[in-house]
Amino acid sequence: MGTDVAFVKMHGLGNDYVYIDVFANPAPEDPAGLARRLADRHRGVGGDGMILVEPSQVAAARMRMFNADGSESEMCGNGVRCVAHLIVARGYAAAGPLTIETGRGVLAIEVMPRGPLQSQVKVDMGPPILLARDVPVEH
């Protein structure tokens, strides 16, 4: 017997993720395993992965991102834009400037709602990593 999981699926410029609102629902006990099951495009909801939207001590929200294989990643620019839309649409933060905590640090964001299902979101991603040797890779 399975466990019910409340989620929403959103996409930002082609990146599609399953989002779990941990403000309103308990965090999954095994997020990596849940990400693998939900992101499976043949037997699950399908997506690039799963993002937990959690309360934060230092920002309006915290995002934890899991790839489709269950590995945890620092962040995704399109994913964080959807997190920003979700927290404003659900009333956890006001539209306008806000911050979101990610595995890469706290990002400055501006949310401009364009209706109940859309927002224009600007994200300051910080300086780009241009050299391959500087890109974090786990072996």
Task: Give short role names for the model-derived ranges.
Residues 1-117:
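A glycine-rich beta-to-alpha transition motif near the start of alpha/beta enzyme domains, typified by
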Residues 37, 138-139:
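Short, solvent-exposed amphipathic alpha-helical segments in soluble enzyme
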Residues 104-138:
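Catalytic phosphate-donor-binding core of small-molecule kinases
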